[in-house]
Every structure is written in structure tokens, then in C-alpha cells.
């Protein structure tokens, strides 16, 4: 895939992010301040209510994938990569991640890992280091031994993290350095997908290899905008765009397990057909009440013979090797090559 196309995609993403108004960032900061002083369960309920209000007011303008010249080029390149088995000998890739937001989710992590193992599907578990649960290091060590990747979701679940000053972000994330070092963490998912230049700069300075916070699929229509990893040359980091979140189906739209699974498969089918990378994020605190949906997603992934299922870091290491980049020390970054 040519460098000019990847640079064009990067410019497109930056333009899309630049459209977020300044006032929205300030309102988000104020909301985070209020939420930070609430009990965890009350906080969760209020966030749920706010998302419901937004859902009822939003009017979605559907956008076709072919409308943008950049995306036309991307679509063509993706189809070529699919026919050439670009992704480590496979025509497409599907990566699974789990953001651990609350204590109820943290408690369900061992069960979730067991379900993943039953289906032979790899995943990345992203933890908060200073939120409303105390990390069980025996559980995390067990995840590593079983072949899962450990990532960082932040120190606290600061939904305005990407809007804050660089010094504030660095101070916050440095609280997680012991965890980062202990588990050789290389990947990040921003709380509430709150990403920005300041956050990316801090992540790069702290030695992160990739971020997966940009959304590449419309949460209401399922229209795929982009599904290809790209590199931020200014930060020396990779971005693996997020395709699906369980929150889109259950918190934002209140779908049944059956309807949610149907939409998830439709999105994955579209990305696989284009030869792209689908990233599915499922929260343990949500999945525990939607196991029919979750097992359906895992079954779909397990049955895809032409699709690669790496941990996110292993996908990035493949891309770094593919571009002849320097990957010194990669043995310590990746998750195990096979699930036990």
C-alpha cells in the first residue's frame, strides 16, 4: 500500500477531528468534573442517561463510502490487499479488545477470558489503574500466560482526557508507569475515545507503540468510513481505528442480542470484503448481560478461515516489519503466538 495513500488517510482523519468545536471540549471537561465527584454506580447511570438523550436528539446523515476521493483510493487499495493476502497471508484481519471500565467488569474478566479461550480467539484487555477497582495482578498475569495482550485504558476514566493540557495528561498517565512497565504495555485506548494531539504526543513520549481510539464506523448507520491502520509520522505511533463497540448496540440503541449480532456481522462482513482491519471492543460490564451476542461474535471470528485474528500489538508489529521499520525488543511487546 503506497505511502501517499496512508498520508492522505492521516490528513483526512485529522480534518475530521478538527471539526469538533472548542465549546464541546469545554463542556466535556465540565461534565467530567461533575462525574468525578459521584459514586461509581451513580456515575454509570448518569452517563447512560446522557447517551440516551443524545440518541433521541441526533439526526444521522448517511454517508456513502464512495463519496470521498481519498476513500475511493482507500477502497481500491483495500480490495487489492484482500486479493493479495496482505495481512500476514490472510485477506483481512479482526482484532478484539476489552476495556475494563468498572468493578463489575473487572470481576468478570476471568469469565470473559475463559469464553475467549473456548473459541480460540485472541484479545487485548485494557485496564484503568486508578479507578473504582483494584487490579488483581494474579488475574492479569494469568491473562498474559494465556496469550492475551495487556493494554492501558488510562489512569482514571477521564472522558475529557484528549482535550486536556499536555502537562495534565502526562501527569495523569505517569501514575500508570508501574503497570505499564510490569506488563510491557504498548497499546492505549482513550476513555470515551477522547483522543487528541496532546494525548498522542504524551503517549509517544511514554513509549507507546499504538493507539486504538479513532472510530472508523458510524455507530448509528454502520457505514464504514475507514478500516485501515495508519501511522502518525509526527508521533511515531500507529493508529488502529475502532470499528464496533458493544455500547453502540446496547447503551446507545437498546438493541436485542440478535439484532446487535446481525449488525456486527454485517459490519465485519463489509470490512473483510474490503480487505481491511476490523477492531471490535466489548466491555466485560456489558457483555456479562449479553452473552448470546458475544458468543456469536466469537463464533463468527473463529470460523473465518481467510481472516487473521492477532492481538492488536501483533498486528502493529507485523506492519512495522512490513514497512522495514526498526522493531528492536519486539519479543517483549507481543502477546503469545497461540492461545493455551
Residue ranges with predicted function:
Residues 1-135, 182, 197-206, 217, ...:
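Terminal accessory/targeting
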Residues 137-139, 162-170, 199-203:
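Metal-dependent catalytic neighborhoods of phosphoester/phosphodiester hydrolases
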Residues 143-148, 178-184, 301-306:
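Structural recognition of alpha->loop->beta junctions
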Residues 147-155, 207-223, 231-233:
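Acidic, His- and aromatic-enriched active-site or binding-groove loops in soluble protein domains
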Residues 169-180:
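An active-site-proximal "capping" alpha-helix that borders the catalytic cofactor pocket
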Residues 186-196:
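Conserved strand-turn element in the central/C-terminal portion of the radical SAM core barrel
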Residues 158-163, 249-251:
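A short acidic, helix-capping loop that chelates divalent metal ions and anchors anionic groups
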Residues 124-126, 151, 189, 209-211, ...:
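Structural detector of well-ordered beta-strand residues that form the stable sheet scaffold
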